[in-house]
A protein has these predicted regions:
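Terminal and domain-flanking low-complexity segments
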Residues: 126-154
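Anionic N-terminal interaction surfaces
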Residues: 2-66
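Non-catalytic effector/regulatory segments
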Residues: 111, 115-117, 128, 132
Length: 154
């Protein structure tokens, strides 16, 4: 890893090589989990849930591959190194799902389950979150398109 890669890793959360490899892994996971996976646009989302006890603060980090196309959203929970992942959860009108945005969060839900997450452009390793997030960078345009999709609704 050269000096420029170290700088990118520190400030953007991913080197160009990590970004490329992780986006390929995300696509492979998605295509393995969802029929016709290439029909969906993909984005990485992260969520932190905080809980406070009297003395201890606990933070739970969650990572998701989110695929979306007109009328449907698919959420796949993943771990930060993309080695383990959960079952694909499909949201569409048939299962009474809805999407919305609120205070920077994207929310998808149906009567049985709901997810709230944040699509991120990058997660700086300097912030200490590198070990909890997938090392990937996404453009502001990608994130904006995703948020607009959620605002519009299914």
């Amino acid at each position: 890893m050269g000096l420029m890669d170290l700088v990118k890793k520190a400030f953007l959360g991913a080197t160009d090589e990590e970004n490329r490899k992780n986006k390929e892994k995300m696509r492979a996971i998605f295509n393995e989990s969802v029929p016709n996976g290439n029909d969906y646009k993909l984005i990485y989302c992260h969520m932190e849930n905080f809980s406070n006890a009297v003395i201890v603060e606990n933070t739970k980090h969650s990572n998701f591959i989110v695929g979306y196309k007109e009328g449907e959203v698919v959420v796949i929970p993943v771990n930060p190194d993309l080695l383990d992942y959960g079952k694909a959860i499909i949201f569409n009108k048939k299962n009474e799902s809805a999407t919305r945005t609120s205070m920077g969060y994207c929310i998808v839900s149906n009567p049985e389950i709901s997810f709230q997450f944040v699509p991120i452009t990058y997660e700086p390793a300097l912030a200490g979150k590198g070990k909890y997030s997938v090392a990937v960078t996404q453009s502001s345009a990608e994130v904006s398109e995703f948020k607009n999709f959620f605002k519009k609704g299914l």
